[in-house]
Amino acid sequence: MKCNNHRILVIDFGSQYTQLLLRRIRELGVYSESCSWNISKSQVYAFNPNGIILSGGPYSVIDNDSPYIPEFVFQLGIPIFGICYGMQIMSFQLGGRVERVIAQREFGCTQVTILSKSVFINDIYDYVDDVTGRFALDVWMSHGDVVTTVPKDFTVIGVNKYRQVAMMANEDRHLYGVQFHPEVTHTKKGKSILERFITCICRCKSSWKIANIIDDIVMDTRVKVGNDKVVLGFSGGIDSLVTALLLRRAIGHQFICIYIDNGLLSNYEFDRIKNFCALNCNLDIIYLSQEQRFFNALIGVNDPEKKRKIIGRVFTEVFEEQIRNLVAVKWLAQGTIYSDVIESGVSLSSFKNVIKSHHNVGGFCGITDIQLLEPIRNLFKDEVRSIGLDLGIPYDIAYRHPFPGPGLAIRILGEVKKEYCDILRRVDFIFIEELKREHLYSKISQAFAVFLPTHSVGIQGDQRKYKWVIALRAVETIDFMTAHWAYLSYDFLNKVSNRIVNEVEEVSRVVYDISSKPPATIEWE
């Protein structure tokens, strides 16, 4: 069966929560994608959504250059749900009134009182208000504009504490709007509201499930590739490993993996993957040692974006050289996932900037007769891991912390040198070993060390020590789109720090990063 026959389209107005919204929809078993606000009619028809959700955004409908909803969207005859800015722009374009407020802005947790019945909200509430006797919701808001007059044929079904419009509905046309964010966990009944819209109003069925996803990827790959030969860029990370196992199931031995040792890897981690593949996966893997080639290309390069581009370019060169030595290869497979696409600014709102480039987004261009194959391009990391478990990958490998494509190059600030990589590998090993020993590794989403290109004074015995500084980074996250720094105990951090400065003689100082995403990214570069 096609696991994405029922689907929701999210029109993205630049909200920081858009990707979280997509995950919430998929958690309900319904496929979702986001698109730019200026999507064409033909693209929407091709996607064939059962319903549309309009995201929030940082803009004001009062400003002339703000993004808007294409008029044809309202003529599709399918349910539409506007969130925050999405509700405001829908109201504005349909004849309602939106005004900017100063004293009555709302940012954070607040309450909404339900005024009237609606299929959209019936029986969904957190408590009964003691004063009014009405049902109420605990919600999360973040807005400076408000809808002061709803469009014709709309009903106000909920208000905030200032009696401003918080929910509106046009039941006949299945158009709905809320001023708050149902996709964030602070809105306690947010999941119920999304589920009501998606399953009851849009009538979507829950078919986006792991077993169905695997079957669809396998069948689509077989149809697309046929009898052609495929080469896969294999890093040993969960994304490329799952891609390899899916290709193995789909096309057998029609593909070969190429693993490039660029000197920027955490080798002790890859040894485990290599052994697992040899014993369980029956994969054909070519191992290439190209360490010096990468280090030579990175000499004198300090800018992180340039480092990413150079690593991607050299990877491309090595792959192209190897592919030319292989017979009849027609496809290049990559373990690109949805978050790679998002952060690279591909297929997103034109109001979003590229956060960072990804070496595995966009493919290789030097060989004109080879096509790009990205089986897991539309999957989030947690979906990839679930598929991995279903394919027989052990839990500790499937949930191994992510390792960036450019490797240690973006965990070394400034110029990359082999000696820095060697230091960082030893430090990182200590940090991860202690996390596992204290049973913290599986509770943390990602942890690693960062090499800071500065010296700091220390004391070792009676000797003055002037050595390098290391930063430790550990975060907790669900989807890697947002993250909070992990609260590690002082005793644990003290133990790790002592081991590092005593066992790695090149290091004199250790610091701990307490920055969340946003505003910081998880990786330092």
Swiss-Prot record:
Residues 7-207 form the Glutamine amidotransferase type-1 domain. It comes from the Bacteria. Its EC number is 6.3.5.2. One of its GO terms (cellular component) is cytosol. Pathway: Purine metabolism; GMP biosynthesis; GMP from XMP (L-Gln route): step 1/1. Keywords: ATP-binding, Glutamine amidotransferase, GMP biosynthesis, Ligase, Nucleotide-binding, Purine biosynthesis. ATP binds at residues 235-241. Disulfide bonds: none annotated. CDD domains: GATase1_GMP_Synthase (cd01742), GMP_synthase_C (cd01997). GO terms for molecular function: ATP binding; GMP synthase activity. InterPro entries: Class_I_gatase-like, GATASE, GMP_synth_C, GMP_synth_GATase, GMP_synthase, GMPS_ATP_PPase_dom, NAD/GMP_synthase, Rossmann-like_a/b/a_fold. The keyword Cytoplasm does not apply. Homodimer. HAMAP family: GMP_synthase. Catalyzes the synthesis of GMP from XMP. This is GMP synthase [glutamine-hydrolyzing]. It comes from Blochmanniella pennsylvanica (strain BPEN). The lineage of its organism: Bacteria, Pseudomonadati, Pseudomonadota, Gammaproteobacteria, Enterobacterales.
